[in-house]
Every structure is written in C-alpha cells, then in structure tokens.
Design a protein with these regions (language model features):
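Anion-binding (especially nucleotide phosphate/pyrophosphate-binding) glycine-rich loop
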Residues: 73-107
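Acidic-glycine-rich active-site phosphate/pyrophosphate-binding loop
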Residues: 31-40, 91-105, 141-148, 203-211, ...
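Flexible, glycine-rich active-site loops centered on histidine and acidic residues
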Residues: 133-167
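Condensing-enzyme catalytic core mediating Claisen C-C bond formation in acyl metabolism
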Residues: 1-54, 156-228, 232, 236, ...
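Short acidic, glycine/serine/threonine-rich loops at helix termini
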Residues: 22, 93-95, 152-156, 323-326
Length: 333
C-alpha cells in the first residue's frame, strides 16, 4: 500500500480593506508630491486607511476571518490554530491573533503572532503548514494584516505615499491529492536591520518625549539600498525554489509577489523570465499593506486560479527577511 504524504492546502481565502480611500491627489495636499510622481515611481494610485478610535489591526484580521469562516462554511470552534503575521499589533501583548481568536469565538484554538515585516505572511504560511503536515492539526487559519497608517509619518513624502491598511486570511487543511504547499525557502539577514525599521517603542528605546519629538515611532527606510537588495533577493530565492523543484517559467501559472513597489516587482519578474501576464498586481489599489499584500492578491485574483496551478509566492521585508513558497492551487474557484 502506498501512503501519500499529507500536504497543507489552502481551502479558502478572504480579504478586507477599509472603506476610506486615500488618493494620490489627497496626498498632494499633505506633502510636496504629485500623482504622476507617485505612479511613475511606485505604481500606486490609492490606498485604504482604517479610520476611527481604537481601531487596530485586530479589526482588519477579524473582518478577514469572519468572512473566511462564512465563505468556507467553517465553525470557529473547528479551528485548531490561528497565526497572524503583522508588524502593527494592537499592543505589545497579548498577541493580535489572540484578540482575533476571542472576537470570532475560536474557543478551541491557540494563537500567536509572527513578526517578519513584509515577509510575515510567507513565514506564517510556512509555519502553519508544518502543523498540518505533521498530522497534529486539521484546520489552521493564517492571517496577514497591517494598519500601516499607524506608523506612517504623513509629513514624509518618501514613505507616506507607499503604505496602506488591509489584510487577508487563508484556511489551511490537509490534502493527499498532491495540491498544496510543495516547498518553501525562508531567509533572513540581521545586518540590514537598521536600513528598514521602527527605531523606537521597543525595550531598547522605549517611548519618551525625545523619541516622539524625533519622530522615531514612524517607519524609517533607506530607499535606494532597499530597492537593490529587494530585487536581488526576491529574484534569487524564487529562482532557487524553481530550480529545486525543476520548474521552468512556462510551468508557472502566476507569480504572486509582495506588493511593495511596481518597479521592484517588474525587475524581479524580469530576472525570473516571467512575462507580465503572469504577474499578479493590485498595488495600484492598496499600496503596500506589508503582511497583507499576498493574501490580498489571493482574494483579488482567486477566480483566475485552477486546481493544480503552479503558483510562486515571493516577498522581501525589514530584518532583512525574504522568502518564496511554491504551491499547487487546491480548488477551482
């Protein structure tokens, strides 16, 4: 008797973005920029912003998970584990995943957050898959969500044009039909940590009048260095996963890259030899939602996917962190 290895398959996806749309034209009123400048350099036309008092990332995550449970006809009490990838948790502790778990009534699940910046969703997806493949968990929810507006300085024209709020969630279940996550590669390099970071607010540099006056609770990044590193690492790791699995570009249905900057995405796809028709983009609508970009692509483009399609996910983020996942889509939408 042949025993097939259990794989971890995505059985449903759902996304959420706030109602408020912040356009490039509105940003022209806040900083010295233009719609043309933003679109040319980033590909972004608008982004969503979560408004209202006491509205944190858990609000986005809860919307995603409630929609996912309804869509997949799943009872919250069936969920074994919830992992939330985010760099904008509601608070240092408890975890945002813990707060979401309570909101949705997942009384039988345990939960935790993963912090790997823009690579967070891939880190969380790879982590969750191990519990499924080990046979110890049947239903795991992975969330990628961020309220980036909470750490963006809207007087900094280089950064404020890039980021938006939003996220998505996926349900992982066991599969024995060879669909699901086939392989993943995750990497990190702490030597680049200071190039893309939040300088204050942690135990090393707690909040103070000085850190607030110095605006150290907002995103800091060295743009040109990040651009070069991101293109190199995203392309290298995607090529590595293709080589490891004997995949050529003609066998790839779609590349789903982290939506940081259209120029980074174009350069990465070009390095991989993948044509623009196979590269999924929604950055023009949402900007960079950090851990939310790839699950939002799942949500936006789900109807394109057919069972057995080869998908390559690729991301790069602060840390530095980067990674790639190769999966076979598990259902026809």
């Amino acid at each position: 008797m042949i025993i097939k290895k259990i794989k971890s398959s995505i059985s449903g996806v759902f996304g959420y973005v706030p109602d408020y749309v912040l356009t490039n034209k509105e940003l022209e009123k806040l900083v010295n920029t233009t719609d043309e400048w933003i679109v040319t350099r980033t590909g972004i036309k608008e982004r969503r912003i979560l408004k209202g008092n006491l509205q944190g990332t858990s609000v986005i995550g809860t919307k995603c998970v409630n929609g996912l449970l309804e869509k997949t006809n799943t009872d919250a009490k069936e969920i074994d584990l919830i992992i939330c990838a985010t760099v904008t948790p509601d608070m240092a502790f408890p975890s945002t995943a813990n707060l979401i778990s309570n909101e949705i009534g997942a009384t039988n699940a345990y939960s935790f957050d993963i912090s790997a910046a823009c690579s967070g969703f891939l880190y969380a997806l790879a982590t969750a898959s191990q519990f499924i493949e080990a046979g110890t968990h049947k239903k795991v929810i992975v969330i990628g969500a961020d309220k980036m507006s909470s750490i963006v300085n809207y007087e900094d024209r280089k950064n404020c044009v890039l980021f938006g709020d939003g996220g998505g969630a996926v349900l992982l279940e066991p599969s024995i039909d060879d669909t699901g996550i086939q392989d993943f590669i995750l990497k990190s390099d702490g030597s680049g940590g200071s190039m893309l970071c939040l300088k204050a607010g942690g135990s090393k540099k707690p909040a103070s009048i000085e850190t607030i006056n110095n605006k150290e609770h907002f995103i800091y990044q060295e743009g040109s260095s990040i651009f070069k590193f991101a293109v190199t690492k995203m392309a290298d790791i995607s090529e590595e996963i293709m080589l490891n699995n004997k995949l050529t570009s003609d066998k790839i249905a779609y590349l789903i890259p982290h939506q940081a900057n259209k120029r980074i995405i174009d350069a990465t796809a070009n390095r991989m030899g993948i044509g623009p028709e196979k590269v999924l983009l929604n950055i023009e609508k949402y900007g960079n939602t950090t851990a939310g970009t790839i699950p939002l692509c799942f949500w936006d483009f789900e109807k394109l996917f057919k069972k057995g399609d080869n998908l390559i996910l690729a991301s790069f983020g602060g840390g530095f962190t980067w990674g790639s996942i190769y999966l076979k889509w598990s259902y026809n939408s």
